[in-house]
Amino acid sequence: MKKFKLKGKAKGAASNLQDKTAIQKHREWRGPQDTAYDYLQWCRLWGILIKWAASHPVQNVKAVWRYRWMFSYLTVPSFFDRLCEGQRGAGLRGARNNLNYLASDVTKTLTTIFSADMHLHPGSKKAEERNKKIICVDELLPNLLGKGFPGCKMILFQEYPMYLPSLINQHSPVHYIEQSELYGLPADVCPLPSFEAGLAIEDDFPKIGCCMLTSNMPCDGSIMTTMLQERRIDLPSQVLNVPLRWKEDEVQDYAVGEITSAIEFLEKHTGQKFDWDALKEGCEIWNKQNECKFEKWDLNRTDIPPHTGSSAWLYRIFEHQAVAGEPLALKNDLKVNRILHKQVAEGKCPKTIRHRAVLWNTPCNNYANFNNWLLNCWGIESVCEMIDIHGEDLIDTSSRESMLRGLADHYQTSTMRAHTKGGSEVMLDSLWEKYEEYNADMIIMFDQISCKGVGAINGLFEEGAMKRGIPMVRVRQDLMDPTSITRREMRNDVNVFMQSVMNEEPVDPSLVEFDDDQSW
């Protein structure tokens, strides 16, 4: 691979990264205004974390010592810094507001979890009472249904011990994946269900809840690990099955029936009657949240795409799955949209954009800030990302029947589901549509080596790109397992493509090759 030299006295962004860990040596300089704003939001984050730690100090210390994955949350400030690397203007402001809202909500949920966790409070009557009002659901089932039980808290069961730690610290999944393989599970299965299985084997899921809704999403690996989790968790459970061919009208009655059955199951185990008025209120708030997202997509179609970077898709997933129908989430969305609209109206673009890329397939958890590197190193702006596009339909709240159908659609088009299931048109044809829609000039295709489903149509993507004359780079990754494909190998796939195929030089040569294998 070609070696690049920095011009003049320029040091490049990599000079601010510690060797091997890639932790920033000091705050990133972004100009006076942006640096000050970034610092104030960083202080705000620390305020959120300190407030959470001080609210239940003994309980939180117990959790850190009880659960291996809790150590990852101690590195959140560094994680947020990585997600904001190189950002300026509205992009920086939107990212920081989204991330700080996420931190605020996650810390509140962790307090709810740990207050009821029987591992931390064995024999506690208070914890037992709290568990009667906690509904556990599979992390790939959006919790909007829980709005119909306002007296209960619906918690994405694997979100906090598994999904978020895998983003924050690339090494957090490794121990649990190894445990699942030592237990005898296949080593070639997707790291996501392997991580979940390892948590169950290690008994590292919090012991909470009165019942649990499981799911057949997103793949057969997850279905198999659900059986293992159920044996370990020991809660009354029911599967909320989601149709595979969700584009077909014939399956919609079945999908509605699954929602209705889930409601009956939850009524039985919570002792509460389903509140349709509360559900309607939650759905209407979610519709407004979705409309805010539609605005962001429209803004990204302009010549000044303001809402990009890794924090954009991460926030969308969290909002769709964990805080749909939450008034505070809507308040944050409206604030961020005002910031984004202002920059586009002023015609300001505070970043170097050479290429507009569509990123397709599931992104890599253990390299969550990959989007930032693409822009900072090569000027590749991720104007559209597959994982960001789901749950696009508004829910009709005019009747109970229409809300049930809207919820069924909401579940069928959730994260890691909207494109990987439903037929080739939602995965293959949608790519070419988004490429035109966002005025892109290249495609970055994530090659998740452990995903058998998408791997089966890799050739169709390549044929389609060649037929249309679209530059497409395949970036290998293994979702949550950094021991299979490292971050450096992912970057190298892009580096080789940009040099040999696109015949370009990087925006920042210092970022072409650096060592971050020991990074969180």
Segments predicted by a language model, with ranges:
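A charged, amphipathic alpha-helical module
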Residues: 2, 7-8, 12-134, 256, ...
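Redox- and metal-dependent alpha/beta enzyme cores, enriched for Fe-S-associated oxidoreductases
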Residues: 129-131, 139-178, 360-432, 436
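Gly/Ser/Thr-rich loops at beta-strand to alpha-helix junctions
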Residues: 135-144, 215-222, 360-367, 449-456
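Short, surface-exposed basic-aromatic patches at helix termini and helix-loop junctions that form
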Residues: 148-150, 226-234, 372-377, 459-471
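Active-site and donor-binding regions of nucleotide-sugar-utilizing enzymes
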Residues: 161-252, 474-476
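Extended, charge-rich low-complexity interaction segments
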Residues: 189-205, 265-284, 409-432, 501-520
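C-terminal regions of proteins
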Residues: 419, 462, 466, 472-518
